[in-house]
């Protein structure tokens, strides 16, 4: 939803030009030999929540899955995600592709609620992973057993974050850039807040 992308008519900006969105989607599906997934938002703003109108046409373009973020573009990341329209798309009897829900999935309990109350086929976790990459393990364990994992020790968290930095450096190929890249993701981590020299 960022301005530099949406302002050019790309990304969430396509929510203002549905024919173009559908043309691009059809062209990509036709051009590649791998499954295509579309991720979009509820609409451009509160007056244009169009996801229930565009889900079927997107499916008709040949996409394999549809991921829906429960906010409009104008909301950015403010306010709460509205999952009611995601549920409406999922409950549409003409929709036969998997529906992935996204927005405010930050705890194992919320992950379970997304499946139980909104019936989605999968969830997408975003900002909750920043500084807490183990959230996937927490969610999977809770979804499988119904039990929360015990809190991890600070040392365990620090060790994971160190490994993350090492892999970032290896992936980027530059120590300074790898550290800078990692630090911005760790700002939300409880372990990171306790480490002045990290």
Locate each region found by the language model.
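Active-site mouth loops of central-metabolism enzymes
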Residues: 13-16, 38-51
């Amino acid at each position: 939803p960022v301005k530099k992308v949406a302002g050019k008519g790309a990304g969430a900006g396509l929510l203002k030009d549905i024919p173009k969105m559908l043309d691009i989607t059809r062209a990509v599906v036709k051009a590649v030999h791998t499954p295509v997934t579309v991720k979009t938002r509820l609409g451009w703003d509160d007056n244009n929540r169009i996801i229930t109108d565009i889900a079927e046409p997107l499916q008709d373009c040949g996409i394999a899955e549809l991921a829906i973020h429960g906010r409009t573009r104008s909301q950015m990341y403010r306010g709460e995600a509205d999952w009611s329209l995601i549920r409406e798309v999922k409950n549409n009897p003409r929709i036969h592709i998997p529906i992935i829900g996204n927005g405010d999935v930050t705890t194992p309990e919320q992950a379970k609620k997304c499946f139980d109350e909104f019936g989605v086929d999968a969830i997408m976790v975003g900002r909750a992973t920043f500084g807490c990459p183990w959230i996937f393990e927490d969610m999977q364990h809770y979804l499988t057993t119904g039990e929360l994992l015990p809190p991890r020790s600070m040392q365990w968290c620090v060790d994971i974050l160190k490994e993350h930095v090492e892999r970032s450096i290896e992936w980027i190929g530059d120590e300074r850039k790898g550290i800078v890249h990692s630090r911005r993701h760790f700002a939300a981590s409880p372990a990171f807040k306790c480490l002045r020299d990290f």
